[in-house]
């Protein structure tokens, strides 16, 4: 089922028993985090806090707190269907030339559908029903969460940041956390390799000293939100991909104060600029690592205008030691990643990002090994193929007789098929998440690959062990006798 906007999604969740309305007053300061954390760990519903303490704007939390709700937001009925979305993205990322006329005709509907999902620009939009400008702009009127006791200030977490570089027609959508530092100012924490930061850098080079236009959409429809965190091919905009997920074109509207286009059905829009050179220290904040991050300097976004729907809903989350929403998103999007990786590396059987690994810091790959050194080729490919894995610190590669999602299997493979010196790949001075304080330099650290595959001639001079396999006939006989033995 597809959802036109966030409210449509809320109705759909409520009909399925996947959303709970909370009418007891709950404070955005620490209390919502506690309630959402307990609910997420219990695999509970999305939560709509209808009476946040001190505010008259409801807060939506734990929206993507289960993989099933992530799948629903992407228009799928189950997490298994996410593989089909991954196959579509794999095809669009690396389209193969048709093998003949019949093959060309079979692929034509896919390309026609992609072309037909170009965003639609509208003149009037519900996200601009109410306009607040100038001195009336006051972010303290929004129920922005203060998530952890050691957090320095309230933090906008689910803001969909819209930017455009000076040499680009396509807009970039990214989700970057934003520390509130004044009634109309937030700190835009985007890492240097992210699309928004790249657009800003190019703008400063081409238009030195001129303000950089930015818009932030809060409470967009689920397909647009999830499109911003999915590995969309560079040839496809996030808005067009959201249209594919939703089954109809994404409606956009031009901002009141700049030329950026934002989701027309979003709940709240922040419009403004970043003045080149205006920076501020950001943090500390509790993050998805389970620790407070160190303070670092990032650009300041000045909010010049807030537009919103009548009676808007504020969409929020928290991040902490897994499980949290980013970890759950990682579990669901894992199913999207598998076909994309298999398109490039057909020998990959499965790929798994354990949620305990903070969404992306560890990956387990199972493969059909075909030659000496093959496992090392695959681990290097994982690091380099998708930018989502540039911060993955540990890649474990093992054979296809191992279940990548079963630690008992994986640990058995590591401890029986690896020689630590021969089968460990260490790479130094590589990009690392700035939130990773374990790295010796902020943003720069090492990576480790573990080759836990059976070794081929050329990789070892020893006779390799044979896996113990039970006798099938004996197993069948004992199955037949089992009830008579009285053991269970």
From Swiss-Prot:
One of its GO terms (cellular component) is plasma membrane. The gene is ubiD. It catalyses: a 4-hydroxy-3-(all-trans-polyprenyl)benzoate + H(+) = a 2-(all-trans-polyprenyl)phenol + CO2. It is a peripheral membrane protein. Prenylated FMN binds at residues 175-177, 189-191, 194-195. This is 3-octaprenyl-4-hydroxybenzoate carboxy-lyase. GO terms for molecular function: 3-octaprenyl-4-hydroxybenzoate carboxy-lyase activity; metal ion binding. One of its GO terms (biological process) is ubiquinone biosynthetic process. Its cofactor is prenylated FMN; Mn(2+). Mn(2+) binds at residues 172, 238. Catalyzes the decarboxylation of 3-octaprenyl-4-hydroxy benzoate to 2-octaprenylphenol, an intermediate step in ubiquinone biosynthesis. Belongs to the UbiD family. It is found in: Cell membrane. Its EC number is 4.1.1.98. HAMAP family: UbiD (MF_01636). The active site is at 287 (proton donor). Pathway: Cofactor biosynthesis; ubiquinone biosynthesis. Homohexamer.
